[in-house]
Regions:
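Non-transmembrane "mature" sequence context
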Residues: 1-123
Length: 123
Protein backbone atom coordinates (compact mmCIF):
# COMPACT_ATOMS: atom_id res chain seq x y z
CA UNK A 1 0.00 0.00 0.00
CA UNK A 2 1.38 3.40 -0.94
CA UNK A 3 0.69 6.57 0.90
CA UNK A 4 0.02 9.67 -1.11
CA UNK A 5 1.93 12.63 0.25
CA UNK A 6 0.97 16.19 -0.27
CA UNK A 7 3.67 18.18 -1.98
CA UNK A 8 4.98 21.07 0.08
CA UNK A 9 3.54 24.35 -1.19
CA UNK A 10 5.92 26.63 -3.06
CA UNK A 11 6.79 29.42 -0.60
CA UNK A 12 7.36 31.93 -3.41
CA UNK A 13 3.93 31.22 -4.90
CA UNK A 14 2.21 31.44 -1.52
CA UNK A 15 3.88 34.77 -0.74
CA UNK A 16 3.01 36.26 -4.14
CA UNK A 17 -0.64 35.32 -3.72
CA UNK A 18 -0.72 36.52 -0.10
CA UNK A 19 0.82 39.93 -0.82
CA UNK A 20 -1.48 40.53 -3.79
CA UNK A 21 -4.49 39.64 -1.63
CA UNK A 22 -3.21 41.83 1.21
CA UNK A 23 -2.75 44.78 -1.15
CA UNK A 24 -6.31 44.37 -2.39
CA UNK A 25 -7.61 44.14 1.16
CA UNK A 26 -5.75 47.31 2.13
CA UNK A 27 -6.97 49.18 -0.95
CA UNK A 28 -3.49 49.57 -2.41
CA UNK A 29 -2.92 50.07 -6.13
CA UNK A 30 -0.19 48.25 -8.05
CA UNK A 31 1.92 51.40 -7.81
CA UNK A 32 1.33 51.57 -4.03
CA UNK A 33 2.31 47.93 -3.60
CA UNK A 34 5.41 48.43 -5.74
CA UNK A 35 6.47 51.32 -3.51
CA UNK A 36 6.00 49.28 -0.36
CA UNK A 37 8.05 46.29 -1.50
CA UNK A 38 10.62 48.39 -3.35
CA UNK A 39 10.11 47.36 -6.97
CA UNK A 40 8.94 49.07 -10.14
CA UNK A 41 5.18 48.85 -10.70
CA UNK A 42 5.72 46.70 -13.80
CA UNK A 43 7.36 44.12 -11.55
CA UNK A 44 3.98 43.70 -9.84
CA UNK A 45 2.42 42.74 -13.19
CA UNK A 46 5.23 40.25 -13.77
CA UNK A 47 4.75 38.88 -10.25
CA UNK A 48 1.04 38.38 -10.98
CA UNK A 49 1.83 36.50 -14.18
CA UNK A 50 4.67 34.41 -12.77
CA UNK A 51 2.92 33.93 -9.45
CA UNK A 52 6.11 34.04 -7.40
CA UNK A 53 7.94 36.31 -4.97
CA UNK A 54 11.05 35.00 -3.23
CA UNK A 55 10.55 35.26 0.56
CA UNK A 56 14.34 35.54 1.06
CA UNK A 57 14.63 38.65 -1.14
CA UNK A 58 14.39 42.18 0.24
CA UNK A 59 11.06 42.60 -1.58
CA UNK A 60 9.91 39.31 -0.12
CA UNK A 61 10.77 40.39 3.41
CA UNK A 62 8.86 43.65 2.98
CA UNK A 63 5.94 41.72 1.50
CA UNK A 64 5.86 39.49 4.58
CA UNK A 65 5.60 42.58 6.80
CA UNK A 66 2.76 43.95 4.66
CA UNK A 67 0.91 40.63 4.86
CA UNK A 68 1.37 40.61 8.63
CA UNK A 69 -0.08 44.13 8.85
CA UNK A 70 -3.05 43.22 6.65
CA UNK A 71 -3.78 40.11 8.72
CA UNK A 72 -3.63 42.11 11.95
CA UNK A 73 -6.03 44.74 10.58
CA UNK A 74 -8.35 42.01 9.32
CA UNK A 75 -8.40 40.46 12.79
CA UNK A 76 -8.97 43.81 14.50
CA UNK A 77 -11.89 44.76 12.27
CA UNK A 78 -13.47 41.37 11.83
CA UNK A 79 -12.76 41.69 8.11
CA UNK A 80 -14.56 45.02 7.62
CA UNK A 81 -13.03 46.14 4.29
CA UNK A 82 -14.49 49.65 4.55
CA UNK A 83 -12.92 50.21 7.96
CA UNK A 84 -9.55 48.87 6.82
CA UNK A 85 -9.54 51.20 3.80
CA UNK A 86 -10.62 54.11 6.01
CA UNK A 87 -7.74 53.38 8.38
CA UNK A 88 -5.27 53.24 5.49
CA UNK A 89 -6.42 56.49 3.82
CA UNK A 90 -7.03 58.90 6.72
CA UNK A 91 -4.52 60.73 8.94
CA UNK A 92 -3.70 58.90 12.15
CA UNK A 93 -2.33 60.81 15.14
CA UNK A 94 -0.80 57.68 16.65
CA UNK A 95 1.24 56.73 13.58
CA UNK A 96 1.99 60.33 12.68
CA UNK A 97 0.54 60.34 9.17
CA UNK A 98 -1.62 58.57 6.63
CA UNK A 99 -0.79 54.84 6.85
CA UNK A 100 -1.07 54.26 3.07
CA UNK A 101 1.59 56.94 2.56
CA UNK A 102 3.72 55.93 5.54
CA UNK A 103 4.13 52.33 4.42
CA UNK A 104 5.95 53.52 1.30
CA UNK A 105 9.10 53.61 3.46
CA UNK A 106 10.52 50.83 5.61
CA UNK A 107 10.46 53.07 8.69
CA UNK A 108 6.83 54.00 8.03
CA UNK A 109 5.85 50.38 7.41
CA UNK A 110 7.41 49.40 10.74
CA UNK A 111 5.68 52.31 12.53
CA UNK A 112 2.25 51.34 11.23
CA UNK A 113 2.89 47.63 11.87
CA UNK A 114 3.98 48.28 15.47
CA UNK A 115 0.87 50.42 16.04
CA UNK A 116 -1.47 47.77 14.63
CA UNK A 117 0.28 45.03 16.63
CA UNK A 118 0.00 47.12 19.81
CA UNK A 119 -3.70 47.76 19.30
CA UNK A 120 -4.27 44.11 18.50
CA UNK A 121 -2.50 43.16 21.72
CA UNK A 122 -5.04 45.18 23.72
CA UNK A 123 -8.07 43.52 22.13
Amino acid sequence: MTVATKPEPDKAAVLAKAVLNAAGQLGLTQADLAGVIGVHRTAISRMKQAGTLDPASKSGELALLLVRMARALFTLTGGDADWIRHFMRTPNNQTGGVPAQQIQTIQGLMTVLRFVDAIRGKV
